[in-house]
């Protein structure tokens, strides 16, 4: 089964909610970019470069400085396996910009846990087809010839893929999407020196939504070995088929 065949939509809604359905009435969520927002120096990037453990800061304090949307407590356990994606319809009052988003799990006891993240420079928002194939829902070439201008006040369709994960979110927990325009300790964003305002469309025919690769609990998983994923004879990579 293709990952797109099992993507579940959660729509960004007024009141900082993530809802399984969207309203026919359009609304807007406004956010002024805070360039001091950060995931801290011990982020996924430090893990890649220096093999350090990921240690995020107080996610609730960070969320207070961002645009956030959260589900109601989940009625059932939900397994997310694959790459989540975010489809935003937005405008900015600047001629450049970026978005940095995190997906978090809010436990029933109030604790918040980091699940994954994604980021995109608006100029690279053109969605392309990967020449060598891509298992995820969204792919950008990041090549010069695919750059798109950013016009202040003009609506943009900004789709980005978050890093793939496999996790089980328990019934009673919630999911929170946190949207920022910067990550001070990890990213150099194009808007440093200015404070643009982002306006994200909620509802209507251009509704912004989070797409989650949710696994059907009634289907037994199958997998195949990915040939040549790693050198040597002792390392294997597997691709889940459903």
Regions of interest found by a model, annotated:
Residues 4-242:
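C-terminal, loop-rich substrate-recognition/catalytic regions characterized by aromatic stacking residues
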